[in-house]
């Protein structure tokens, strides 16, 4: 299989001065022979099977057409696996580059070489080798110029434009003029108007006019003081004369008195008539009570239909004039009649509101006494309502005020289904046992239920059942017999099962002694915490102690 190629001898001339012959050829060893392998024909990767002969079958392919073998040397030289059919040169000559423009319309696939990207160096992909250029960084962060100390500090400093600043604007706000710098205007005026006594050089004046690119503003012009000040000020279009302000000397004495009472009074500049202070809203408590006591407003609004149609709707000229004043006593008598009729039919919450109004009216501040003479002659609405409430209490028709209740259900309305009533606290219950339990727990302090283990007493049975759960699982020891009974039972053989039952069954262990089980269960039950010492007699709850 393996054939060896003959080695070619190599000779080298060496000089020897000792011998008579000055040069001779020395035989050098040849290189290591290279092994050659015979060419192997290509075999198809997929096997081909013949189809079984049938009427409609065709003869199978005998063999696949072999691919032509190229004249490659048989030596195992490292080469690419798919051998290209034709090699293309990577270098574009100048003669070929000149002919590209004419050949591009005739042949396909001939284009200019692609431009290298910015992230790679020059002539790395398909550009000519003679092209040598530096890559441009895509991000200035990777350029490395940030850490160089030789850069001037003026490069990194932001540019400033003093012309665009609002503080350097020479014109008033909201005026369409050029935004010129004050310093530039002054400098330009000095250049245009040279002083007769000064000895300045004439080179400064034509500097601005000769080179207009030095100044961003237009060519300055001479302006007078009157032209700069006589412009249309937008503030004069909206604001009137400044002298039309409110003067403190024009205030009247009535206004000063109203300001001392902390009441707001508007004063017109043309001496318009003013409204008097409303005496009903002098104190804050009266105003707040009118907002909070909604029951009174409801009772006033829930009158008869005839009263609402006659009194509330009929508003003539006299009533409009008397609107700021308080209502007369006749209207209060009518209100009292309607209120008394309604209070006789309502329940206890109405009485509470009446009593609260009387208490709040008695504790009113002294500001109510400093009212006008008209309001002092007529009683207030709150006093009338409290008097009407007191009259209903004296008659005895109203229900007493409900006391504070104890429990989860705090309903304001009484349930008619609760037929059993407590005589001491007027509390009602649906069942008689609930009433008895209420007597024992609150009034009599009777505790008929007692715990059998710790002796603690309870007034309710459900409390006892809940307490009994704290004494453990309630395991009962199986060893109920005493020591004498256990000794007699052991002597008679009752503690062990008869052994003849398991004599026929092989490898069956004998049952253990039940006496040992009884002792273990008794000890476990004794170690369970929950004795009477763990709980106090006053009923305070404590957590159960656990033993490790």
UniProtKB/Swiss-Prot annotation:
* Superkingdom, taxonomy of origin: Eukaryota
**What's an example Gene Ontology biological process for this entry?**
regulation of transcription by RNA polymerase II
Q: How does it assemble?
A: Interacts with HOG1/OSM1.
State one Pfam family annotation: zf-C2H2
Q: What is this protein called?
A: C2H2-type transcription factor MSN2
> Any phenotype upon disruption?
Leads to excessive accumulation of lipid droplets and restricts infectious growth in rice. Results in fewer peroxisomes, more lipid droplets, and higher levels of phosphatidylglycerol, phosphatidylinositol, diacylglycerol, triacylglycerol and free fatty acids.
Q: Which UniProt keywords apply?
A: Cytoplasm, DNA-binding, Metal-binding, Nucleus, Repeat, Transcription, Transcription regulation, Virulence, Zinc, Zinc-finger
GO cellular component term, pick one: nucleus
Q: What does the UniProt entry say about where the protein is found? A: Nucleus; Cytoplasm
| Primary residence | nucleus
Which InterPro entries does UniProt cross-reference here? Ikaros_C2H2-ZF, Znf_C2H2_sf, Znf_C2H2_type
Q: Which gene is this protein's source?
A: MSN2
Q: Where do the ZnF regions (C2H2-type) fall?
A: 420-448, 449-471
Q: Which GO terms describe its molecular function?
A: DNA-binding transcription factor activity; RNA polymerase II cis-regulatory region sequence-specific DNA binding; zinc ion binding
Keyword flag Transmembrane: no
Answer whether the UniProt record assigns the keyword Nucleus to this protein. Answer: yes
Protein function? Transcription factor that acts as a key downstream transcription factor in the HOG1-MAPK pathway. Regulates the expression of a series of downstream genes and controls vegetative growth, conidiogenesis, cell wall integrity, stress response, mitochondrial morphology, and pathogenicity. Binds to a putative promoter region 1500 bp upstream of the start codons of the target genes MGG_07019, POX1 and DCI1. Binds to the AGGGG and CCCCT motif of the COS1 promoter region.
